[in-house]
């Protein structure tokens, strides 16, 4: 993200590979807030297969346009409701947030690589120089 110092507005490219990878990876759940200018994706509450009284919500915040581990933050919230529909919500620390983050980074790298390969001006640095 670029910071425009005059306005305090952050510029985030929606064509960014991490943004696109996140949207693709979160397509299994409804999204409640997708703000590309603010660099955030928030899912709606959704229930895991085996639990009707527990729901989770995923937040993905983009801190950079670059494909880097410190350029993205994934947070997961869990809501548990009792039989009287009283609910408690808390942020959870689990391996799931790290797994989602890694999946986004891997998918973003794959997207970037495929775009480079299809770019006619791209020269593969691994290719041997045949000029003598």
What are these regions (language model features)?
Residues 1-132:
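Ser/Thr-rich, low-complexity intrinsically disordered terminal regions
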């Amino acid at each position: 993200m670029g910071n425009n110092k005059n306005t305090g507005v952050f510029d985030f490219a929606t064509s960014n590979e991490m943004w696109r990878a996140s949207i693709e990876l979160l397509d299994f759940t409804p999204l409640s807030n997708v703000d590309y200018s603010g660099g955030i994706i928030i899912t709606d509450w959704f229930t895991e297969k085996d639990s009707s009284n527990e729901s989770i919500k995923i937040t993905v915040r983009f801190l950079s346009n670059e494909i880097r581990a410190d350029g993205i933050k994934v947070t997961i919230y869990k809501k548990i409701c009792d039989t009287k529909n009283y609910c408690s919500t808390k942020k959870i620390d689990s391996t799931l947030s790290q797994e989602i983050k890694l999946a986004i980074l891997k998918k973003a790298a794959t997207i970037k690589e495929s775009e480079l390969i299809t770019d006619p001006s791209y020269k593969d640095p691994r290719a041997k120089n045949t000029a003598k």
